[in-house]
Amino acid sequence: MKNAIVPFVFACCLLISVDLAHAQGFLKVDGKKIVNEKGENVLLRGIGLGGWMLQEPYMFELSDAAGTQTEIKAKITALIGQKNCDEFYRFFLTNMITEKDVDALKKWGFNSLRLPMHYNLYTLPIDKEPLKGQNTWLEPGFKLTDNLLSWCKKNKMYLILDLHATPGGQGNDRPIADIDTLKPRLWESEANQQKTIALWKKLAERYKDEEWIGGYDLINETNYKLEGNESLKKLFSEISAEIRKVDMKHIIFIEGNQFANDYTGLTPPWDKNIVYSFHKYWNPTTIETIQKYLDMREKYNVPLWMGESGENTNEWFRDAVKLFENNNIGWSWWTIKKIGSESSLMTISKPAGYQKIVDFWTGKGPKPTVEEAKATFMDLAEKVKFENCKINNEVMDALLGKK
């Protein structure tokens, strides 16, 4: 009987969930719910900004050519030179996510964004620091984040910061964290862990008074053998403690090991403003598949957030969103834009010379000239703009119930 009642109760909560156009104040934890400062239930409906600060090869049809973003950049540099590569990336980062994207997302019905951050836009790798143990802060990442936040504030949308690629990398899946296997991982290096802690404190200092920052998603999808998750719990606790020295208000989102699914050793919550964030891919959309998270919510009186899902059919999307919302679980979908894919919210069209470059990189064709290759990459930096992307209305319909 209890399992039958719970979805009904949460469905009733949705009927009184706040309209964010009139919401005020920081998000916070209230028992099993995420609420605003008026105590109104807030159901997050969001999109992950994948491919912007961190380019996973598959999102650009480059899986056969490169394993990580670093490898992509190295190949581009070898083809067109460092100066041209830097120019391309400046335009790409400027154009991939703009105010037009955020305005449209708000208009369509989304109320939040999840920003997958690459640490190297904010600080130097440990082996490039002028002094060992020093943290050199870089302007590009902070400026991009500031701009994005200003667009979110204008649209009254929450922005959740997600450290997608940590110093050293948090797992064995190389593409999602831009991992160099010749360098120490996050879990093998105290210096990388200290830089991660310092970065989160720096972010918290910068955004502590920003009510449209929805919270801090500390580490994306750890996937590493950690006995009892003790090292993960230790690092989460240390990051949380440093954040709380400067910011007592924002939610801290905690993902489990094994791609945000294993919470061994990560309960009970050690902070009064923690939300547990699970991810869901490639399994049925039945309540049984999320029951362990519902049980965790019930046992520890803590909210849940489904921080990442996607890469499936529109029918699956629709059923998954229904499952989450019937159980008062906010969500963030993956992802906003990809090349040649209709499972993302928008599709980036492939530049005319793009396949020639891919063929060269995969040993299937001749090398393009510097001029040809640079023109192709600069065209890509134009094609990622909102106004040049194809909107996949079927995906939007599946997520938001539009007609």
Spans of features found by a protein language model:
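Extended, alpha-helix-rich binding/interface surfaces that flank or overlap catalytic cores
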Residues: 330-332, 337-403
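Extracellular glycoside hydrolase catalytic/binding regions
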Residues: 26, 188-339, 343-362
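Bacterial Sec-dependent N-terminal signal peptides
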Residues: 1-24
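Active-site mouth of glycoside hydrolases
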Residues: 38-44, 49-251, 256-264
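Generic structural signal for residues positioned in beta-strands
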Residues: 33, 46-48, 275, 330
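A general structural signal for short secondary-structure junctions and capping/turn motifs
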Residues: 2, 37, 321-325
